[in-house]
Amino acid sequence: TNIQQYLVNTSKVDFLAHRGLLKSLYGEQHPCGKIVVEEDYHAITPEVLREFYERYYHSGNCSIFLSGKVTEDIISRVTDTFGTSFGQHQQPASKLSFSFTAVPEKRIFIEREDAMQSAVKMGYTTITRNHPDYLKLRVLMTLFGGYFGSRLMSNIREEKGYTYGISAGIMFYPDSGLLAISTETDNEYVEPLIQEVYHEIDRLHQEPVS
């Protein structure tokens, strides 16, 4: 069940570190930083799901995107099939905006005594998809930690041997982007691994990419 899967996840250091990162960057009042607890699953009832479905699953909230060699015949067929109204409501859902505030602490430690390894999550909020530098940032993050031959992998995995895998990427939310670095390592390598991440960040600042 979902509850069982949740309980399994809460025993994993990667899951706990990811939640801790989001909570520390966005705060508990922001949807991204709100931490789900077991009681939240028990509060979900058929009535709650039915009300949610009726309120939000309707043609007023539906958009259709076509790509490729789109002809008038295709548009006509799509319109005939999906173009009619459905659902009990037609009012589009309002788009809410949430402010967020990061905690002042730069490091958050989540203890789990029986853990064989430590999960390391590093990140900060960044630009959204509609920013003019979006594509440039995507290219930079690919170089930094987005594939097997990235700088993080070459240094921290191949050269130093601190981890089997480390990655960096961007997650996008409606009002924010999140740049995150993720890995797991032996407890003894946590500090030197973090220092090497900072070293690679400094390289991006100081050395032109070739």
Where are these regions (language model features)?
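His/Glu-based metal-binding/catalytic segments typifying zinc-dependent metallopeptidases
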Residues: Q90-S150
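Charge-rich, well-structured scaffold segments of protease-associated domains
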Residues: T1-P92, F109, T128, E158-S210
